[in-house]
Amino acid sequence: MAKHISKQDSENNTTRREFIKQVGFSAAAAGMVTPLLNKAYPVTEQKTTECRVKYRVLGKTGLRVSEIGIGGHSWAYKQVPDGQGGYRRPTVNEATRMIAAGMDKGVNFLDSCTALQESSVPGEALKRLKARDQVIVSIRVSHKMKGIKADKQEIYKWTEDRLKLWQTDYVDLCLLCNTENDTLQSGYWDMSYSIEALDKLKQQGKIRFTGFGCHFTPELFLEAFEKFGDYFDTCSIPYNIRHRAAEKVLPAAKKKGLGVITIKPFVRGALLKNRDLTGTDAGLPRDLISFVLENKLVDICTCGVHTIEQVRENLSASWTKLSPGGRQRLEKLAAFDIGEKEYAWLEEGWRYA
């Protein structure tokens, strides 16, 4: 049976803090970072004790969620410098330190990738931290993908696979996702068998709440809200300084009481490409997240992290207001062509006309 997310376990809190103290930040001398617990990111005059992630309510779920969540791309892609001019994925030890540091600042939402890219790393990290019941775990299950048979058994299979990867007997949120051919003709909108499958998974105690969303257009989101908004609890929508069509979509989501989870604040790094993030462009990731959080119709901004420095930078957006100068910088950034063919779906569908 799913356990209530608000349960606080002092023993687990101690375990997490001790892990950070004994394992995580002892690595600073080996090239890690300044301890997150001891030195807040120097962008505000607030006291360190006040530098914690704020919370919002995730729509009709009623869940109290951190307004910044850790995205699934954190573990699935090679983004960590390997010291030899290339990149690699974070190790389990690195992931454990990052998740522990985030939780100590109040983060309680961990998202997943689309099913074909899922990783076992965050599940192993939570096991080491004994922290499963202190976070909200969201998985993404392929409702319909090219080459994947669309039926209830596939949804059961994807879900069981995700439960094993996360080393848990339940997840808090299960989102139906599609990664290509998101059209009315593709069959994505035949949700009858999907809803039946989700209902069964709920009855079995394997999922608590449901949602949907991925790469389809704002127009199709609006249609989905109208058709399925009464059933689902949440939606996942791309939103960033360049791709702002979500601002036309979010009111409809809230009208249905849906919790809103935004993705792609950096367009998977495209907005940060070739930027001097330790010099003239310092604070840019923070400001990109701050922009998203200014929209009070957003409940969670999920973002990828690949190093503990990025954890510290991203979370600081929760207690750092976007300055006029920062806003001007973002507006200039939004005018540049990102030049990423992989994200043509964002360019074509999510920019204001």
What kind of region is each of these model predictions?
Residues 75-92, 141-153, 278-279:
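Active-site mouth loops of central-metabolism enzymes
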Residues 73-75, 113-115, 140-144, 176-179, ...:
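Active-site beta-loop-alpha junctions enriched in small/polar residues
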Residues 148-236, 241-244, 248, 254, ...:
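Glycine/proline-rich, positively charged
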